[in-house]
């Protein structure tokens, strides 16, 4: 078995409905440009507020993917 190296990037997803949808949006959007995603870790949840009401849920997600060298 060969050694593997993984890279981690942080993305923030948003949703007007829930934190779960916000996290899903973050992962699905990242998957459009990153290959071989492995693990998503929700590291922070917050909301945006306007006029005293929650308008969007936000999920900050660290996503790991397999690093491919240019060699």
Model-derived regions, located:
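Basic/polar N-terminal segments that are highly enriched at the extreme N-terminus
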Residues: 1-2, 71
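C-terminal structural segments of small proteins and small subunits
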Residues: 52-71
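Short, well-ordered alpha-helical segments
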Residues: 4-38
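Short, conserved loop-to-beta-strand elements that form functional interface hotspots
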Residues: 40-49
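Broad gene-expression machinery/nucleic-acid interaction feature
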Residues: 6-8, 44, 56-62
